[in-house]
Amino acid sequence: MYNPWQVGASLAPARAGPRPFPTPRARPPDCSGGHAPSGFPALGLRTAQRPRPFSSSPRSASGRLRGPRPVARGPAHSSSPTGLPAYLPPAAALDSQTSAPTVSPVTRPRVVARGKTPRVSLAGLETLSSLLHQQQLFD
């Protein structure tokens, strides 16, 4: 049966196993004009330098991290005795002030990418404003 991925499979003698790639051909000569001495490519053509594989991670090809070390900053890593972030008041203080049903505090703020402002949806704004109005009624 003909396999379109086997290039020249009908012409080549039968081999053990499939050959998915054609045999490498000789590279066409550089059309740069002028001769470079002793097999060096002409200046301005960097044939020896391969393009770097694209990767979004800061790790280099050797596996080590490039650039400065990431610094853990902000209240997300604060050490308070309850394990909650330091900027949240303890739940007892909240209970003594208001009789509103207490919402369990978020243990960790959502990490927003640097340089990006967190987007708030319209529904979120409406719920926030309604919650604030409830708080003012309870005070």
UniProtKB/Swiss-Prot annotation:
Disordered, as annotated region: 1-116
Biased composition (Low complexity): 50-70, 84-110
Protein origin, superkingdom: Eukaryota
Protein name as annotated: Putative uncharacterized protein FLJ43185
Organism: Homo sapiens (Human)
Taxonomic placement: Eukaryota, Metazoa, Chordata, Craniata, Vertebrata
